[in-house]
Amino acid sequence: MRLKSNIWVAAYLRRCQTEGVYGAVVRRGAEEAGAVFVKVSLLDGQAMLYAPAPQTSYDDDRPVDRFFVPVAQQPLPEHTIEERLAKEIRFDPDAWIVETEDRAGRHFLDLAKT
């Protein structure tokens, strides 16, 4: 059983804070099981977006973990990411959007193995 989305987001933001990275909830989704998208602003007009990994990426040995995949391998213009997030919200109104700011692009997420 996975952590509720609101608890995971609170813990993730606390982790960012302890690493000296600013983070905030841009959009609250469903507290129980809303998908979480993480935008990492590089503070230069570019950003990275991390989306929930497909269910097939989950490890049976670690069922409580959340895994993410980068939407693109390279940073994208922030307006492109905002357009993508708007589409995600139209598709899934229960989704969460969390944004962090870090010039180095640190995200502190568990990435799915590809």
Model-derived features with residue positions:
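Long, contiguous binding/interaction regions
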Residues: M1-G20, R28, A53-S57, R103-G105, ...
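A generic local secondary-structure boundary/capping motif
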Residues: L13-R14, V25-R28, L85-I89
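Short Pro/Gly-enriched beta-strand edge/turn motifs at strand-loop
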Residues: T18-G23, E82
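Short, basic and Ser/Thr-rich N-terminal targeting/leader segments
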Residues: E19, E32-G34, F91-D94
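Short, well-structured hydrophobic secondary-structure segments
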Residues: Y22-Q55
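Helix-rich interaction surfaces within compact, conserved domain-sized segments
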Residues: A53, D60-T114
